[in-house]
């Protein structure tokens, strides 16, 4: 497991680590101090993931803005 403040190499690795933390926390088997440490790491990973998603969204918007004919529309899963 990466050190406490170390950022995972990729969004996917961060998400995987976050899912593992959630599983451990949901098990209810962790001592309080360890659970708090895991929770803290999970919050950190969630924030890093959110930052990476925002950066990706900005890159897409920049790429689309270079094309004058392309229009940005908000993503909704119902639009297919």
Swiss-Prot record:
Q: What's one GO BP annotation on this UniProt entry?
A: DNA catabolic process
Which reaction does this enzyme catalyse, per its entry? Exonucleolytic cleavage in either 5'- to 3'- or 3'- to 5'-direction to yield nucleoside 5'-phosphates
Where does it reside?
A: Cytoplasm
Main localization category: cytoplasm
Q: Does the keyword Cytoplasm apply?
A: yes
Q: Which SUPFAM superfamilies match?
A: XseB-like
Keywords for the protein's UniProt record, in alphabetical order: Cytoplasm, Exonuclease, Hydrolase, Nuclease
Give the EC number. Answer: 3.1.11.6
Q: Name one GO molecular function term.
A: exodeoxyribonuclease VII activity
Whether Endoplasmic reticulum counts among this entry's keywords is no
Output the Gene Ontology cellular-component terms: cytosol; exodeoxyribonuclease VII complex
InterPro entries per record: Exonuc_VII_S, Exonuc_VII_ssu_sf
Alphabetized NCBIfam families for the sequence: PRK00977.1-1, PRK00977.1-4, xseB
Q: Whom does it interact with, and what assembly results? A: Heterooligomer composed of large and small subunits.
Q: What does this protein do?
A: Bidirectionally degrades single-stranded DNA into large acid-insoluble oligonucleotides, which are then degraded further into small acid-soluble oligonucleotides.
Q: Which family does it belong to?
A: Belongs to the XseB family.
Query: What PANTHER family has UniProt attached to this entry?
Result: EXODEOXYRIBONUCLEASE 7 SMALL SUBUNIT (PTHR34137:SF1)
Question: What is this protein called in UniProt?
Answer: Exodeoxyribonuclease 7 small subunit
Q: Which gene encodes it?
A: xseB
